[in-house]
Amino acid sequence: DLLSGVRSPRGFMLVCLRGEEAQFETDRRHMGLTELTMAEAKNLVPILNTDDVMRAALSTTAQDIDTDMMLQRFVGLLRTNGGQVETNQTVQAITKISEGWQVDTNQGQFTARKVINAAGAWGDEIAKLAGIPEIGLTPMRRSVARLAAPGGLDVQSWPMLFGPGERWFAKADASA
């Protein structure tokens, strides 16, 4: 199976600080999350400060994805089937032709029966070049802080944590 071993259980916990109750409730309902007592939440994530965290809700179905492993498997499958990966190029135009697609880059021109848009958050920009309707992707700048677990705690089994509106998140990093 192509995705065997790529996913692992994680779960996620939505946590609410004072003043975020309305957005928390909207998110909790929208995601169908089970609300926890503060004791239950603290049992799962012992460092939660229950003086600041007012409410918490949990999903046990969320999973981590080993994105590097997944990508390497997809690249292997692509190459096994005669495909190629082209990197470090700027796509300038994508044109539908009778044999499939023509892609013009700053490094040259390529033709293929199929083209995979792997631009992630910038996928709408590539879609636009191909005359394909945008779906509303918004690239966002993120900041990362890698911190040692407090007090030597084992955080690997903790759910991912995030706040209402998904303005921030925290999760154990397997490579830390």
What does each of the following model-derived ranges do?
Residues 59-114, 118:
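Helical element adjacent to the flavin cofactor pocket in flavoenzyme catalytic cores
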